[in-house]
A protein has these predicted regions:
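Extracytoplasmic gate region of multi-pass secondary transporters
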Residues: 22-23, 203-253
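Extracytoplasmic
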Residues: 3-35, 63, 222-229, 344
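Cytoplasmic helix-loop-helix junction between adjacent transmembrane helices
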Residues: 105-141
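Helix-to-loop junctions at the C-terminal end of transmembrane segments
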Residues: 61-74, 254-267, 352
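Helix-loop-helix hairpin linking two adjacent transmembrane segments in secondary transporters
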Residues: 130-131, 135-186
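Conserved MFS/SLC helix-loop-helix module at the cytosolic interface between two early adjacent transmembrane helices
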Residues: 61-97
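Structural signature of the two symmetry-related core transmembrane helices
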Residues: 77-91, 270-285
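Intracellular juxtamembrane helix-capping segments at the cytosolic ends
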Residues: 115-128, 308-322
Length: 389
């Protein structure tokens, strides 16, 4: 089963690349899809931002089915669907002749993402029964490793004069091979749908708040992840792609710390209050202190507090409300997360269009507002959880 969990975590390693690679290759993709150059000579990358947002749309379309499907027909099927869709996404984006085709493949990528979510999270929580929160954090850990390595891979590909498509193709092939393994590896035994009496999902206010943290926590890091490069340029940072590596190191550190904190007995819900609070303060600092170093510090801190598994802990916290329907609980939080991905990034794309050079700072304010709402939600869950459990 350990091998199974490694094969599953590997899909997230590739997913880490899939989730952030379009953001790193915005100008190349935009040029390939026939974007116009802006007045200052840079490419108009707003169409790429829209395509990235379509990943959220794809997740949204498929999540209502993927959770129940995984709970009912088994995790393996869900994983295989995810892998096939992911391989299609990488190849599709790499060779898409136009934005329209890319948009369609991004939706397929989103579908892949949601089937992996409802396969990997519940399976790893079932393999490591004693530490489900920690098992779930490791999905994030795998993504983190690949997002940390991605800037180096991009540099390597560029140095070797290979096409920007190289990483897409390699990643697509790798996840396909991994899928073949998943097809044959053993999965944990589960009490099948027959024995469990169908519990009707009761969504209490606190459970709803826990689900909505999926929205706010995703917005915090999505906005940062997709808009930090522009902020770095605005603050005259010499190499804005460094922010990405600082961010990954922060996430890395947070996952290890959170795992230790949880083992030591810190409640997940407290992390859901403390981390967003740290993000909120950091975003404020990035807004008021306009110098290049703050972007790197911000990258690390947002990586730590924004992306360091808050979303995964929201999943574990929500799963406590629905012990019999972990797959469905996962998809509820991820639905909230995808709505965030789609709406907030579409809004960010719009701000980027109308805001001109001050757009990156306007996006920081948007991010602060959403993050603040997340803190309030977590406080609400903390106060009401005991009454309902």
């Amino acid at each position: 089963l350990v091998i199974t969990s490694i094969a599953l975590y590997f899909t997230y390693f590739i997913h880490g690349i899939g989730a952030s690679i379009m953001g790193q290759y915005k100008p190349e993709l935009a040029a390939h899809w026939g974007a116009k150059a802006l007045s200052d000579g840079t490419m108009d990358v707003s169409m790429v931002v829209s395509v990235i947002a379509a990943l959220g749309l794809g997740r949204l379309i498929s999540l209502p089915f993927s959770g129940p499907l995984s709970d009912k027909f088994g995790r393996r099927l869900s994983g295989i669907i995810g892998v096939i869709c992911y391989a299609a996404y990488f190849m599709g984006i790499a060779f898409a002749p136009s934005m329209g085709v890319a948009y369609a493949f991004a939706i397929v990528g989103g579908i892949a993402n949601s089937f992996l979510d409802t396969c990997v999270s519940p399976t790893c929580m079932e393999i490591y029964v004693n530490n489900p929160s920690v098992a779930n954090l490791f999905t994030k850990f795998s993504m983190c490793i690949s997002q940390f390595l991605l800037p180096f891979l991009i540099g390597f590909v560029a140095a070797a004069n290979m096409s920007y498509r190289t990483i897409f193709i390699v990643a697509g092939a790798a996840i396909f091979i991994d899928g073949i393994l998943i097809l044959f590896l053993p999965f944990p035994e589960r009490n099948t749908a027959g024995t469990v009496k169908k519990e009707k999902l009761k969504i209490t206010p606190a459970a709803l708040a826990a689900i909505l943290i999926g929205f706010t926590s995703s917005s915090t890091f999505m906005l940062w992840l997709n808009c930090n490069q522009e902020l770095g340029k605005l603050y005259n940072l010499s190499d804005p792609s460094k922010i990405q590596s600082f961010y990954a190191v922060g996430t890395f550190a947070a996952i290890l710390c959170s795992s230790v904190f949880i083992k030591k007995g810190l409640k997940e819900i407290n992390i859901l209050i403390i981390y967003p609070l740290i993000s909120f303060i950091m975003l404020g600092l990035c807004y008021f202190i306009q110098n290049p170093t703050i972007c790197l510090i911000g990258g690390f801190v947002i990586g730590f507090a924004g992306a360091g598994g808050v979303l995964q802990l929201a999943v574990s916290t929500t799963a406590e409300f629905f012990p019999e329907n972990k797959g469905t609980a996962t998809s509820l939080v991820m639905i909230a997360s995808s709505i965030a991905n789609y709406t907030i990034l579409s809004l960010a794309g719009y701000i980027t269009k109308v805001g001109g050079s001050s757009a990156p700072r306007m996006i920081l304010l948007l991010n602060m507002a959403v993050t603040f709402i997340g803190i309030l939600l977590a406080l609400f869950v903390k106060m009401n959880r005991g009454k309902e459990a």
